[in-house]
Amino acid sequence: MEPSMDVNSVTISVEGMTCISCVRTIEQKIGKENGIHHIKVSLEEKSATIIYDPKLQTPKTLQEAIDDMGFDALLHNANPLPVLTDTLFLTVTASLTLPWDHIQSTLLKTKGVTDIKIFPQKRTLAVTIIPSIVNANQIKELVPELSLETGTLEKRSGACEDHSMAQAGEVVLKIKVEGMTCHSCTSTTEGKIGKLQGVQRIKVSLDNQEATIVYQPHLISVEEIKKQIEAMGFPAFVKKQPKYLKLGAIDVERLKNTPVKSLEGSQQRPSYPSDSTATFIIEGMHCKSCVSNIESALPTLQYVSSIAVSLENRSAIVKYNASSVTPEMLIKAIEAVSPGQYRVSIANEVESTSSSPSSSSLQKMPLNVVSQPLTQETVINISGMTCNSCVQSIEGVVSKKPGVKSIHVSLANSFGTVEYDPLLTAPETLREVIVDMGFDAVLPDMSEPLVVIAQPSLETPLLPSTNDQDNMMTAVHSKCYIQVSGMTCASCVANIERNLRREEGIYSVLVALMAGKAEVRYNPAVIQPPVIAEFIRELGFGATVMENADEGDGILKLVVRGMTCASCVHKIESTLTKHKGIFYCSVALATNKAHIKYDPEIIGPRDIIHTIGSLGFEASLVKKDRSASHLDHKREIKQWRSSFLVSLFFCTPVMGLMMYMMAMEHHFATIHHNQSMSNEEMIKNHSSMFLERQILPGLSIMNLLSLLLCLPVQFFGGWYFYIQAYKALKHKTANMDVLIVLATTIAFAYSLIILLVAMYERAKVNPITSFDTPPMLFVFIALGRWLEHIAKGKTSEALAKLISLQATEATIVTLDSDNILLSEEQVDVELVQRGDIIKVVPGGKFPVDGRVIEGHSMVDESLITGEAMPVAKKPGSTVIAGSINQNGSLLICATHVGADTTLSQIVKLVEEAQTSKAPIQQFADKLGGYFVPFIVLVSIATLLVWIIIGFQNFTIVETYFPGYSRSISRTETIIRFAFQASITVLCIACPCSLGLATPTAVMVGTGVGAQNGILIKGGEPLEMAHKVKVVVFDKTGTITHGTPVVNQVKVLVESNKIPRSKILAIVGTAESNSEHPLGAAVTKYCKQELDTETLGTCTDFQVVPGCGISCKVTNIEGLLHKSNLKIEENNTKNASLVQIDAINEQSSTSSSMIIDAPLSNAVDTQQYKVLIGNREWMIRNGLVISNDVDDSMIDHGRKGRPAVLVTIDDELCGLIAIADTVKPEAELAVHILKSMGLEVVLMTGDNSKTARSIASQVGITKVFAEVLPSHKVAKVKQLQEEGKRVAMVGDGINDSPALAMANVGIAIGTGTDVTIEAADVVFIRNDLLDVVASIDLSRKTVKRIRINFLFPLIYNLVGIPIAAGVFLPIGLVFQPWMGSAAMAASSVSVVLSSLFLKLYRKPTYDNYELRTRSHTGQRSPSEISVHVGIDDASRNSPRLGLLDRIVNYSRASINSLLSDKRSLNSVVNSEPDKHS
């Protein structure tokens, strides 16, 4: 059997895929082809990656196979990449007679198996596999009737590898083989060396450039093997000495006192008692080869029973006979091992297990030697487990592995915790064991293993060193990505980040709102990704763990110049893969390209390029096409322009000839009519014309010229039509190109046939041909397509503008510890890494999303947010990629780069929206599928009907045929007339205009919306928005700003007793420890009033939910003193301002502009007892509330403003009212929506009083208050059941289910606060007037779609009957070229109609405001209908979920701060069956 060792991989771009069905079709069809091992098609990347056998397939044949399926396949790189393979040696242990042919046929049918070699005499199979497709476990499952044992040449640490391969009398040899470039080299080497007598097995690794050989030294020598390899043209060097079971000469020389065993003795080694164990620190080990050298050399000493070497810990544990050898001798033995560069020291860990060790040996040992065996613990993430059987299977297999102390696998959390001996096994080995069982196992990214000291001896010091403690407590970091849905604004992001950081085991959280993704760093020993996702779900969001989410971020494609041979490739690959954080590196010498996968948190693209540069090569990014050429249709425009000009060049003479012949025909017809000329004379005069003269019998000059001019147009101008028509017919479909090809081909073929017949019959009368039809058809069709693509390019201008905003370069700066600029570097924007400091100069574009760290400026964000006015930026402000810096230079820290930037997400959103189909378009596409066959049938029917009519009543044809001539026969006249009518029917029918009606309008509509800061996710919401009858607003964050602010501070004590500034300082300090939103608002207000960022000290802080807080405050004197100094400074400034013409200095300074009298500067630190809360909290603490204060709180509560009381040292000092203010444009937006005939509803989880107050301010008369999250969905559904289309507008956590349930979900954001998952329509700006604009734009777009459908309907319903000759009696008739012109005009008119949407402008709200000012106004509370809870729907409501319970408790807590006298604890404690 010829081995097929070569396996290649090629990636082919595939255009034309629209759904998953296309992907499956390609994978199934191509996957069945001979020689295909694996195929993976990506709809997102529009590519197919195929692993194949180059002997059976080539990239070109694969491309053609995909082309034949009707897709456009493009091969960017014709040079395939080699695919790594591995060889499994499977030893058969069964004793029965083996069906070798059966095994071979079974395995060869398996995907991923490339070659099988059978050695019946050795009962062994060598199976070559592609590890990325199939693994050893799957191979063994394919032959269940046989018990197979893996004796494969897998890479294992230590001597275990070698001894598992070598039987008695056999030796393992490793030889370095250089110059191998492909798998053909490895297979050739294995084939020739494996045939040598004495060679039992051989495995050649292309990656490591080495050969591992098991041979019998009595049959063949090392030199002979080396010579045979070099004879094949590969330089060979012995990498390791053969493992004879005796010491080498140099070791004997250095260990003269140690007896050396003979070869015979080595095969039956005596078992010595293990008296002691010593741990040595070995410096100088670099790789597994060093480990293997030491482990293979030291056990040859007579008194050493075992050794385990750890490369990670740079240590070795040796068990030996203490009565015969000392640790010092073992140190010398290790240092003598080749290459003799190891530095060995004892780690003071010698365990004596002998019952009576000799006193001499004990004296040689250090006095402080202790017993301290090491145990480490690792966590392995395991996916693919489905039941407890999987858990028991993993625990059973792994626990049997050497070095494993214990294992516990958690099915719920999908991870396993393994306690193991690091000197006997490693985490990677354990992971591979689990993978071989068929599960996916991933090790967390750990910087330092957690070391546990087990069973310390009595001599162990009680106080370990600090360093040991540090090593034990080193945190293990892992990273996961979680897809989060339902986020609508920055408060959602802050909520998730704040709550996750509180959970044990989570180090950091970064949430990207635009991408809907959270990046979490965590300790895998404490918490796992599924648990983190559950925490997020408990917060009210949808959350799923993203598998392999970090792969997309860490893929780098480079062009590497300067490589000359395979050695250069190996040098780059080996150097890069040694770097931490680089998972994979593949360099192709032929294409000079490198493909690298890396962890962006550990290493960045600039670091990788610098590393390659340090090797002496030049590396640069593969330039991506950042242009919008695919949007402006430049290639298609150029193609159709060329086609039009070619057709026009040849068509112009044809049209001239046709017009000349028509004029001459008219001239002779006039003579015939006036002079009563006979038919014979008519024919004679007609043939006397120059163009009608015959060159050959039956062939006139006119027909010859027409044929010559028609040929290039037919086959060059129409080439594209033929290709598209062929592909359509091949897949049993029909499109516009089929109609065009049918019309032109039939006309050309008909004319050519009758011309050949006339020449064959040597006819004296020239036949009437239609060679003029194809050129004229192609001219008008090419012109129409050219104009159509120009117009289509205009429809995507908005998206092209967004893409053009992306910066191409960034200036990265380096700062020192004092933020002083050290250096600047100009890099490609794709090389920017998160955390980079970027400098943006005035007029420059922001290359990435970031946060300002230094500088002040104004930024133009108009092209992204639609906001015309520049936005001020200062340190701490966020900036959006693509916006333009105006005045000052800024330093920003990159937070989101690459595909995660806001601009990239907006571009992606608009692209997806413009390719989505509206429901009306789906109907049009379905209609278009039946249109072409219907037109073909009509055309055939027209041909047959007119032939029948002509033979029945020739007078009709004679009367209405414009080109009738008595010089031709009746039969020819009838056939020509019928043929012309049928061709015209084919030409005028146009399904294109029907198909263009909706997508062009959707493209323009979504593009115009994006330019105005309104992102509409596709055609369906764009079409649905105009049907909306009810608009439901959430209150918090939508109608209101969503952040409470202090509305009023009322001081209830005299100022000389406690000044207002002192009350603010105490209250601000007390509330600074509170996490309640009202507490944060109070703290912010106090800091602003006192003009400070620091407050006093708060101790004994306690919070009672639903009541208030208590604490003790100190250290506010310095704060007050600082405030007094500012007051004095301001007073001085104000006094100097009024010293105009002042004579008396005393009088001039007594100005009324002095703010306050200076307060006494207290220097003694005083402690204040503080209570802040509602009336119930004050009453609990024994305070009496006066009627005036009580009335004031009731008044605030009626207006929806929570009010809290403040006591200092048991004295009521102040009242603070807090409110969530209404947005200024809310009232106007509500009024405009009502004037458009829409019903406006307010739905909120807040209490009825607050809801009524807010509704009265904005003019909403219908309110649903105290609605729980799950009930918002039920209420939207209830409105829908009433037959109303509902639009839900919101931005909060609890709004996302209702947004999904509504017919149109609208999410409001601010700047970068744009949701992707939760809504159908997204506003980049936080402006309620955009709700009006989105509905108005939807109405305009749908109106335009309806107009667009009108054009093709008129063309086809009127044009087809005219073309078929129905209206001949009234003189309406079309020639074929007229039909093609009309068809082209229909498509162009539809696209031009859609372009009128570009004239759309958002309504002028200034005019709206002027026009509606007299009509708008606040509603009185009596006019507002407030419904509490879900009203009549409560009977069918489910029990409250976890989120609803949390919200219920929170509401009770917040509402209890209102002025209502009754306690709301009953609401919390009672079972909320009534949902109110």
From Swiss-Prot:
Binding positions (Cu(+) 1): 18-19, 22
Give its localization.
Answer: Golgi apparatus, trans-Golgi network membrane; Cell membrane
Residues noted as binding Cu(+) 5 in the record, renumbered to the chain: 489, 492
Tell me the active site: 1034 (4-aspartylphosphate intermediate)
Tissues/organs with expression: Expressed in most tissues except liver.
PROSITE patterns, per this entry? ATPASE_E1_E2, HMA_1, HMA_2
Q: Which reaction does it catalyse?
A: Cu(+)(in) + ATP + H2O = Cu(+)(out) + ADP + phosphate + H(+)
Positions binding Cu(+) 2 in this chain are 182, 185
Where the record annotates domain HMA, the positions are: 8-74, 85-151, 171-237, 276-342, 376-442, 478-544, 554-620
Top class in the EC scheme: translocase
UniProt-listed Enzyme Commission number(s) = 7.2.2.8
Q: Which SUPFAM superfamilies match?
A: Calcium ATPase, transduction domain A, Calcium ATPase, transmembrane domain M, HAD-like, HMA, heavy metal-associated domain, Metal cation-transporting ATPase, ATP-binding domain N
Query: Glycosylation annotated at which residues?
Result: 674, 685, 887, 953, 1130, 1134, 1448
Q: How does it sit in the membrane?
A: Multi-pass membrane protein
Topological domain, Cytoplasmic: which ranges?
Answer: 1-642
Where is it predominantly found? Answer: Golgi
Which UniProt key words apply to this protein?
A: ATP-binding, Cell membrane, Copper, Copper transport, Glycoprotein, Golgi apparatus, Ion transport, Membrane, Metal-binding, Nucleotide-binding, Phosphoprotein, Repeat, Translocase, Transmembrane, Transmembrane helix, Transport
Residues noted as binding Cu(+) 4 in the record, renumbered to the chain? 387, 390
Q: Which residues bind Cu(+) 6?
A: 565, 568
Residues with PTM Phosphoserine: 338, 352, 356, 361, 1420, 1422, 1450, 1453, 1456, 1459, 1463, 1466, 1476
Q: Which residues cross the membrane?
A: 643-665, 695-717, 736-760, 770-788, 930-952, 978-998, 1347-1373, 1379-1397
PANTHER family, per this entry? P-TYPE CATION-TRANSPORTING ATPASE
Q: What is this protein called?
A: Copper-transporting ATPase 1
Q: What organism does the record attribute this protein to? A: Cricetulus griseus (Chinese hamster)
Kindly list the organism's lineage.
Eukaryota, Metazoa, Chordata, Craniata, Vertebrata
Gene expressing this chain: ATP7A
